[in-house]
Protein backbone atom coordinates (compact mmCIF):
# COMPACT_ATOMS: atom_id res chain seq x y z
CA UNK A 1 0.00 0.00 0.00
CA UNK A 2 1.42 3.39 -1.03
CA UNK A 3 2.20 6.11 1.46
CA UNK A 4 -0.20 9.04 1.62
CA UNK A 5 -0.07 12.72 2.51
CA UNK A 6 -3.16 14.88 3.00
CA UNK A 7 -3.31 18.68 3.15
CA UNK A 8 -6.32 20.23 4.83
CA UNK A 9 -7.64 23.33 6.58
CA UNK A 10 -10.18 23.75 9.37
CA UNK A 11 -12.22 26.53 10.97
CA UNK A 12 -12.43 28.67 7.82
CA UNK A 13 -8.70 28.48 7.23
CA UNK A 14 -7.64 29.37 10.77
CA UNK A 15 -5.85 26.02 11.00
CA UNK A 16 -3.57 24.38 8.43
CA UNK A 17 -3.02 20.64 8.72
CA UNK A 18 -0.72 18.24 6.88
CA UNK A 19 -0.80 14.58 7.87
CA UNK A 20 1.21 11.73 6.35
CA UNK A 21 1.52 7.96 6.47
CA UNK A 22 5.18 7.30 5.62
CA UNK A 23 5.72 3.62 6.39
CA UNK A 24 6.92 2.58 2.93
CA UNK A 25 9.34 5.45 2.34
CA UNK A 26 10.84 5.10 5.82
CA UNK A 27 11.23 1.36 5.24
CA UNK A 28 13.08 2.06 2.00
CA UNK A 29 15.34 4.64 3.62
CA UNK A 30 16.36 2.50 6.58
CA UNK A 31 17.06 -0.49 4.32
CA UNK A 32 19.31 1.57 2.06
CA UNK A 33 21.31 2.70 5.09
CA UNK A 34 21.05 -0.60 7.02
CA UNK A 35 19.87 1.19 10.16
CA UNK A 36 19.80 -0.21 13.68
CA UNK A 37 16.51 0.42 15.57
CA UNK A 38 17.38 3.77 17.19
CA UNK A 39 18.97 5.03 13.98
CA UNK A 40 15.87 3.89 12.05
CA UNK A 41 13.59 5.88 14.34
CA UNK A 42 15.77 9.00 14.07
CA UNK A 43 16.07 8.85 10.28
CA UNK A 44 12.40 7.92 9.93
CA UNK A 45 11.21 10.90 11.94
CA UNK A 46 13.39 13.25 9.91
CA UNK A 47 12.21 11.76 6.62
CA UNK A 48 8.60 12.19 7.72
CA UNK A 49 9.21 15.80 8.77
CA UNK A 50 10.97 16.42 5.46
CA UNK A 51 8.09 15.04 3.42
CA UNK A 52 5.55 17.22 5.22
CA UNK A 53 7.66 20.38 5.03
CA UNK A 54 8.56 19.68 1.40
CA UNK A 55 4.88 19.51 0.53
CA UNK A 56 4.56 23.10 1.81
CA UNK A 57 6.85 24.37 -0.97
CA UNK A 58 5.09 26.32 -3.69
CA UNK A 59 7.25 25.64 -6.76
CA UNK A 60 8.35 22.31 -8.23
CA UNK A 61 11.88 23.73 -8.38
CA UNK A 62 12.02 24.58 -4.66
CA UNK A 63 14.04 22.32 -2.35
CA UNK A 64 14.14 22.07 1.44
CA UNK A 65 16.90 20.46 3.46
CA UNK A 66 16.73 19.69 7.19
CA UNK A 67 19.88 19.02 9.20
CA UNK A 68 19.91 18.12 12.88
CA UNK A 69 23.04 17.37 14.90
CA UNK A 70 23.21 17.60 18.67
CA UNK A 71 26.57 15.94 19.14
CA UNK A 72 25.06 12.52 19.89
CA UNK A 73 26.08 9.11 18.58
CA UNK A 74 23.80 9.46 15.55
CA UNK A 75 26.35 11.97 14.20
CA UNK A 76 23.65 14.04 12.55
CA UNK A 77 20.71 13.37 10.25
CA UNK A 78 20.12 15.16 6.94
CA UNK A 79 17.06 14.97 4.68
CA UNK A 80 16.18 16.77 1.47
CA UNK A 81 12.62 17.05 0.16
CA UNK A 82 10.70 18.56 -2.71
CA UNK A 83 7.28 20.04 -3.44
CA UNK A 84 6.09 16.72 -4.90
CA UNK A 85 6.70 15.11 -1.47
CA UNK A 86 9.69 13.08 -2.64
CA UNK A 87 12.39 12.80 0.00
CA UNK A 88 15.86 11.38 0.54
CA UNK A 89 18.12 11.34 3.58
CA UNK A 90 21.00 9.83 5.50
CA UNK A 91 22.22 9.43 9.06
CA UNK A 92 25.85 9.85 10.07
CA UNK A 93 25.95 6.66 12.14
CA UNK A 94 23.32 4.13 11.00
CA UNK A 95 24.56 1.64 13.61
CA UNK A 96 23.60 3.74 16.65
CA UNK A 97 21.29 1.78 18.96
CA UNK A 98 20.77 3.01 22.51
CA UNK A 99 18.92 1.59 25.48
CA UNK A 100 15.25 2.56 25.70
CA UNK A 101 14.54 5.93 27.30
CA UNK A 102 12.63 6.50 30.55
CA UNK A 103 9.33 6.06 28.70
CA UNK A 104 10.42 2.71 27.31
CA UNK A 105 10.74 4.10 23.78
CA UNK A 106 13.62 4.25 21.32
CA UNK A 107 15.93 7.00 22.56
CA UNK A 108 16.03 9.26 19.51
CA UNK A 109 16.77 12.32 21.65
CA UNK A 110 19.75 10.58 23.23
CA UNK A 111 21.07 9.47 19.84
CA UNK A 112 20.81 12.93 18.29
CA UNK A 113 21.89 14.84 21.39
CA UNK A 114 21.00 18.32 22.58
CA UNK A 115 24.25 20.23 22.10
CA UNK A 116 23.73 21.52 18.60
CA UNK A 117 21.22 22.96 16.17
CA UNK A 118 18.49 22.29 13.65
CA UNK A 119 19.10 23.87 10.26
CA UNK A 120 16.30 24.42 7.77
CA UNK A 121 17.61 25.36 4.33
CA UNK A 122 15.12 26.46 1.68
CA UNK A 123 16.49 26.79 -1.86
CA UNK A 124 14.16 28.81 -4.06
CA UNK A 125 16.60 29.01 -6.97
CA UNK A 126 17.86 32.44 -5.95
CA UNK A 127 21.50 33.43 -5.44
CA UNK A 128 21.46 32.41 -1.80
CA UNK A 129 19.18 29.91 -0.03
CA UNK A 130 17.15 30.91 3.01
CA UNK A 131 18.69 29.35 6.13
CA UNK A 132 16.90 29.07 9.47
CA UNK A 133 18.90 27.92 12.49
CA UNK A 134 17.58 27.15 15.98
CA UNK A 135 19.13 25.39 18.98
CA UNK A 136 18.01 21.81 19.48
CA UNK A 137 15.09 21.73 21.90
CA UNK A 138 14.90 18.04 22.86
CA UNK A 139 16.52 16.11 20.02
CA UNK A 140 13.30 14.12 19.54
CA UNK A 141 12.83 15.84 16.14
CA UNK A 142 9.11 16.66 16.44
CA UNK A 143 9.67 19.09 19.31
CA UNK A 144 12.58 20.63 17.42
CA UNK A 145 10.57 21.18 14.24
CA UNK A 146 7.77 22.79 16.27
CA UNK A 147 10.32 25.02 18.03
CA UNK A 148 11.76 26.06 14.66
CA UNK A 149 8.38 27.11 13.28
CA UNK A 150 7.46 28.99 16.44
CA UNK A 151 10.78 30.82 16.86
CA UNK A 152 12.11 31.24 13.32
CA UNK A 153 8.84 31.70 11.42
CA UNK A 154 6.62 33.02 14.25
CA UNK A 155 3.99 30.38 13.42
CA UNK A 156 2.54 28.48 16.41
CA UNK A 157 2.91 24.85 15.37
CA UNK A 158 2.21 21.41 16.80
CA UNK A 159 4.23 18.52 15.39
CA UNK A 160 3.76 14.81 15.95
CA UNK A 161 6.15 12.29 14.39
CA UNK A 162 6.34 8.56 15.00
CA UNK A 163 8.23 5.48 13.81
CA UNK A 164 7.42 2.01 15.11
CA UNK A 165 10.22 -0.49 14.45
CA UNK A 166 9.13 -4.14 14.33
CA UNK A 167 11.04 -7.12 15.76
CA UNK A 168 12.46 -7.97 12.32
CA UNK A 169 13.80 -4.37 12.10
CA UNK A 170 11.28 -3.42 9.41
CA UNK A 171 9.05 -0.40 9.91
CA UNK A 172 5.67 -1.42 11.26
CA UNK A 173 4.15 2.06 11.25
CA UNK A 174 5.42 5.56 10.52
CA UNK A 175 3.69 8.87 10.13
CA UNK A 176 3.40 12.46 11.19
CA UNK A 177 1.22 15.51 11.47
CA UNK A 178 1.97 19.23 11.43
CA UNK A 179 -0.76 21.60 12.62
CA UNK A 180 -0.31 25.36 12.27
CA UNK A 181 -2.38 28.25 13.56
CA UNK A 182 -2.71 30.91 10.92
CA UNK A 183 -2.45 34.65 11.74
CA UNK A 184 -5.50 35.85 13.65
CA UNK A 185 -6.59 32.36 14.73
CA UNK A 186 -8.61 32.04 17.94
CA UNK A 187 -6.31 31.23 20.89
CA UNK A 188 -9.02 29.05 22.44
CA UNK A 189 -8.92 26.97 19.27
CA UNK A 190 -5.23 26.26 19.81
CA UNK A 191 -5.97 25.03 23.34
CA UNK A 192 -8.72 22.72 22.08
CA UNK A 193 -6.43 21.22 19.43
CA UNK A 194 -3.73 20.67 22.06
CA UNK A 195 -6.19 18.72 24.22
CA UNK A 196 -7.28 16.62 21.27
CA UNK A 197 -3.70 15.82 20.34
CA UNK A 198 -3.16 14.60 23.89
CA UNK A 199 -6.26 12.41 23.57
CA UNK A 200 -4.99 11.09 20.24
CA UNK A 201 -1.79 9.89 21.88
CA UNK A 202 1.07 8.33 19.94
CA UNK A 203 0.70 8.57 16.17
CA UNK A 204 2.15 5.11 15.62
CA UNK A 205 -0.12 3.58 18.27
CA UNK A 206 -3.09 5.23 16.57
CA UNK A 207 -2.08 3.85 13.17
CA UNK A 208 -1.16 0.45 14.62
CA UNK A 209 -4.69 0.10 15.96
CA UNK A 210 -5.92 -0.19 12.38
CA UNK A 211 -6.83 3.45 11.90
CA UNK A 212 -5.73 5.67 9.02
CA UNK A 213 -4.61 9.26 8.59
CA UNK A 214 -8.18 10.00 7.46
CA UNK A 215 -9.37 8.77 10.85
CA UNK A 216 -6.76 10.98 12.49
CA UNK A 217 -8.03 14.08 10.69
CA UNK A 218 -11.60 13.26 11.63
CA UNK A 219 -10.66 12.58 15.26
CA UNK A 220 -9.00 15.99 15.54
CA UNK A 221 -11.12 18.21 13.30
CA UNK A 222 -14.42 16.53 12.41
CA UNK A 223 -16.50 19.30 14.04
CA UNK A 224 -14.30 22.15 12.77
CA UNK A 225 -15.45 22.43 9.15
CA UNK A 226 -12.58 20.25 7.93
CA UNK A 227 -11.76 20.73 4.24
CA UNK A 228 -9.39 18.44 2.32
CA UNK A 229 -7.28 20.47 -0.11
CA UNK A 230 -4.97 17.92 -1.71
CA UNK A 231 -3.73 14.36 -1.43
CA UNK A 232 -0.22 13.31 -2.47
CA UNK A 233 1.85 10.12 -2.66
CA UNK A 234 5.19 10.70 -0.91
CA UNK A 235 8.16 8.53 -1.89
CA UNK A 236 11.79 7.97 -0.97
CA UNK A 237 13.50 8.95 -4.21
CA UNK A 238 17.08 9.95 -5.01
CA UNK A 239 17.76 12.08 -8.08
CA UNK A 240 21.50 11.45 -8.24
CA UNK A 241 23.12 10.81 -11.64
CA UNK A 242 26.56 10.47 -13.19
CA UNK A 243 26.20 13.97 -14.64
CA UNK A 244 25.53 15.45 -11.19
CA UNK A 245 28.53 13.63 -9.73
CA UNK A 246 30.69 15.00 -12.56
CA UNK A 247 29.50 18.54 -11.80
CA UNK A 248 30.24 17.98 -8.11
CA UNK A 249 33.78 16.84 -8.91
CA UNK A 250 34.35 19.85 -11.15
CA UNK A 251 33.04 22.15 -8.42
CA UNK A 252 35.77 21.13 -5.95
CA UNK A 253 38.22 23.17 -8.01
CA UNK A 254 41.37 22.56 -10.02
CA UNK A 255 43.74 22.04 -7.08
CA UNK A 256 41.77 19.27 -5.36
CA UNK A 257 40.75 17.60 -8.61
CA UNK A 258 44.38 17.60 -9.76
CA UNK A 259 45.37 15.79 -6.55
CA UNK A 260 42.79 13.11 -7.31
CA UNK A 261 44.10 12.84 -10.88
CA UNK A 262 47.72 12.61 -9.74
CA UNK A 263 46.87 9.58 -7.60
CA UNK A 264 46.48 7.72 -10.87
CA UNK A 265 43.65 5.54 -9.57
CA UNK A 266 40.07 4.83 -10.51
CA UNK A 267 37.87 6.83 -8.16
CA UNK A 268 34.61 5.45 -6.79
CA UNK A 269 32.00 7.92 -5.55
CA UNK A 270 29.10 6.62 -3.47
CA UNK A 271 25.88 8.65 -3.19
CA UNK A 272 25.25 9.21 0.51
CA UNK A 273 21.48 9.28 -0.03
CA UNK A 274 20.91 6.05 -1.98
CA UNK A 275 24.20 4.15 -1.98
CA UNK A 276 24.59 4.19 -5.78
CA UNK A 277 28.23 3.69 -6.88
CA UNK A 278 29.84 5.78 -9.62
CA UNK A 279 33.31 4.87 -10.94
CA UNK A 280 35.60 7.31 -12.73
CA UNK A 281 38.80 6.12 -14.42
CA UNK A 282 41.92 8.23 -14.17
CA UNK A 283 41.42 9.22 -17.81
CA UNK A 284 37.88 10.41 -17.05
CA UNK A 285 39.16 12.45 -14.09
CA UNK A 286 41.67 13.98 -16.51
CA UNK A 287 38.87 15.03 -18.86
CA UNK A 288 37.00 16.66 -15.96
CA UNK A 289 40.21 18.48 -15.02
CA UNK A 290 40.38 19.91 -18.55
CA UNK A 291 36.83 21.25 -18.10
CA UNK A 292 37.88 23.01 -14.88
CA UNK A 293 40.71 24.75 -16.73
CA UNK A 294 38.49 26.04 -19.55
Swiss-Prot record:
A Gene Ontology molecular function term of the record: protein folding chaperone
Nucleotide-binding in keyword set: no
An annotated GO BP: protein refolding
Predominant place of localization: cytoplasm
Disulphide bridges, residue numbers: 238-240, 271-274
GO cellular component, one term: cytoplasm
Subcellular location as annotated: Cytoplasm
Similarity remark: Belongs to the HSP33 family.
NCBIfam families: PRK00114.1 (NF001033)
Protein name: 33 kDa chaperonin
Taxonomic lineage from the root: Bacteria, Bacillati, Bacillota, Clostridia, Eubacteriales
